[in-house]
C-alpha cells in the first residue's frame, strides 16, 4: 500500500529514511567474481558461439515491416539527440602566442553487454549502439545470453554484426581480454546482474565502463492542475523498472494525493504481474502533502533525486532552484520515458523480479581525449620554476631553465 503523509516532520524523516538507505555493496559478490575470472583465465578461452550471417539475414524475415520502421525511427531520433551533443575539438590562441586545446577521438572497439530479461532490453541496446555509432566507434561487439529477431535486426540497423551468445562474468572477461579469434575491446557498457556489475568494476582499470547507478530515485512535484492518473502511472512505471529505488510524490493538494493512491491501488488489483511493483511502492513509495511546493527546492537539493518530474503549471521557477537532480522533466506532459529517446538521458536498466541494476552512458564511454599545447617561444613563468624548485624536482627545473635560455638567445 502506497503511504500518505501530511505532517512536515514525518515527511522529512521519511525522506531521510529513503535517501540514507544503505546502498548494496558489490564486495559480497566480488570474491565470486574474482574466482569466476580466474577460472575463465585457466581455461582455453574458446570463443563463445557467434550469431551466423544466415541467422542475421533470417531475422529480417521474422519481423514485420512496421516493427522495422519503428526501429529505424528510434535510431534516427537517437542520432538527432546525440550528434549536437558530441564534444568537439577545441583550440584557443591566447595573446601570449601559445596554442592550447583538446582533441576527441573514438575508441577503436567497444563491447555492449545486453541482459534480455525483463526491462527495456531493446532500448538499452539502441542507446548503447547509437551513441557508439554517432561517436564513430569502428568496431562494435554485442554479447547477450538470449537473442530475438528484434534484437538482431536492431543491432544490424546500427551496424553491429559481431554478436556472441555469452553472459555473466565470462562475457565481461572475454570482452576485456579477448579470446581465440576475438580481439579485446576498449570499453564495456550495459547493465546486468550484480555479479556482472561487480565484474565491470573489477576490470575498470583495463577498459572504460559506464557509470554504475547506486539507486535511481524518483521525486515528483505536482500542483493542483496535475492529472492524478498520469502521476500514478509515473510512480508505477518507475517502481516497475526500479523496484529497489524510491518513488516519491510531493503535492500541496490532499485530494490529488488521495486520487493517486486510489489509482495505484486499482492498477495493482487489475494487473496480475504487478506484485513486485506493489511491494516496491509499499517499501519505497510515498505520497506527501506539503504546505508550499515552492519551498520544496531545499528538499530536492538535500535528497538529490536522480529523476525529478515537475508536474506544475509554472515549472521553470522551480528549475532555477534545483541544483542536485540528474534529470529534470518539465511540465505535465514530460514523463521520464521520453528522456531515453528525446533528451539523451542514457540510463541502462535491467530488472529481474525485485532486483534491478542500472548504469549511465556518457560520451566518455566511447571517446578518448588528448590535451594539446604548443608553447611557442615563450619562457616558462617564474612561479613555475619556483614551484618545482621548492619540491626538489631538479630535472624539471633544469628543463624549464633551458626554455628560458632559448628565449634569451
UniProtKB/Swiss-Prot annotation:
Taxonomy, superkingdom: Bacteria
Keywords, alphabetical: Oxidoreductase
GO BP annotation list: L-histidine biosynthetic process
Name the UniProt record assigns to this protein: Histidinol dehydrogenase homolog
Principal EC category: oxidoreductase
Assigned protein family: Belongs to the histidinol dehydrogenase family.
EC number assigned by the record: 1.1.-.-
Alphabetized InterPro entries for the sequence: Ald_DH/histidinol_DH, Histidinol_DH_monofunct, Hstdl_DH
Amino acid at each position: 500500500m502506497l503511504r500518505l503523509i501530511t505532517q512536515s516532520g514525518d515527511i522529512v524523516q521519511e525522506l531521510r529514511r529513503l535517501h540514507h538507505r544503505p546502498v548494496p555493496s558489490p564486495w559480497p559478490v566480488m570474491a565470486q567474481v574474482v574466482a569466476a575470472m580466474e577460472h575463465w583465465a585457466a581455461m582455453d578461452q574458446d570463443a563463445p558461439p557467434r550469431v551466423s550471417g544466415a541467422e542475421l539475414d533470417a531475422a529480417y524475415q521474422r519481423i514485420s515491416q512496421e516493427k522495422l520502421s519503428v526501429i529505424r525511427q528510434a535510431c534516427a531520433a537517437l542520432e538527432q539527440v546525440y550528434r549536437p551533443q558530441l564534444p568537439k575539438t577545441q583550440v584557443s590562441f591566447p595573446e601570449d602566442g601559445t596554442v592550447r586545446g583538446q582533441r576527441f577521438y573514438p575508441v577503436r572497439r567497444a563491447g555492449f553487454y545486453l541482459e534480455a530479461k525483463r526491462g527495456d532490453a531493446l532500448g538499452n541496446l539502441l542507446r548503447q549502439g547509437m551513441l557508439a555509432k554517432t561517436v564513430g566507434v569502428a568496431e562494435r561487439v554485442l554479447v547477450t545470453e538470449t537473442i530475438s529477431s528484434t534484437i538482431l535486426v536492431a543491432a544490424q540497423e546500427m551496424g553491429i554484426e559481431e554478436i556472441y551468445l555469452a553472459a555473466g562474468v565470462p562475457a565481461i572477461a572475454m570482452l576485456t581480454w579477448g579470446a581465440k579469434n576475438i580481439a579485446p575491446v576498449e570499453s564495456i557498457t550495459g547493465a546486468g546482474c550484480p555479479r556482472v556489475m561487480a565484474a565491470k568494476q573489477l576490470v575498470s582499470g583495463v577498459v572504460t565502463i559506464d557509470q554504475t547507478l547506486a539507486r535511481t530515485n524518483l521525486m515528483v512535484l505536482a500542483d493542483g492542475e496535475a492529472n492524478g492518473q498520469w502521476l500514478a502511472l509515473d510512480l508505477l512505471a518507475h517502481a516497475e523498472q526500479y523496484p529497489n529505488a524510491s518513488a516519491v510524490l510531493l503535492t500541496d493538494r490532499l485530494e490529488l494525493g488521495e486520487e493517486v493512491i486510489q489509482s495505484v491501488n486499482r492498477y495493482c488489483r487489475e494487473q496480475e504481474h504487478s506484485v513486485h511493483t506493489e511491494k516496491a511502492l509499499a517499501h519505497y513509495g510515498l505520497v506527501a502533502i506539503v504546505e508550499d511546493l515552492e519551498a520544496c527546492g531545499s528538499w530536492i537539493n538535500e535528497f538529490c533525486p536522480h529523476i525529478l518530474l515537475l508536474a506544475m503549471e509554472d515549472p521553470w521557477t522551480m528549475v532555477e532552484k534545483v541544483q542536485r537532480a540528474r534529470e529534470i522533466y518539465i511540465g505535465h506532459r514530460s514523463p521520464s520515458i521520453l528522456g531515453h529517446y528525446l533528451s539523451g538521458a542514457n540510463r541502462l536498466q535491467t530488472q529481474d523480479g525485485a532486483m534491478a541494476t542500472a548504469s549511465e552512458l556518457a560520451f566518455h564511454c566511447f571517446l578518448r581525449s588528448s590535451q594539446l599545447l604548443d608553447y611557442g617561444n615563450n619562457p616558462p613563468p617564474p612561479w613555475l620554476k619556483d614551484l618545482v624548485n621548492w619540491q626538489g624536482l631538479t630535472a624539471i627545473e633544469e628543463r624549464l631553465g633551458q626554455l628560458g635560455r632559448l628565449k634569451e638567445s
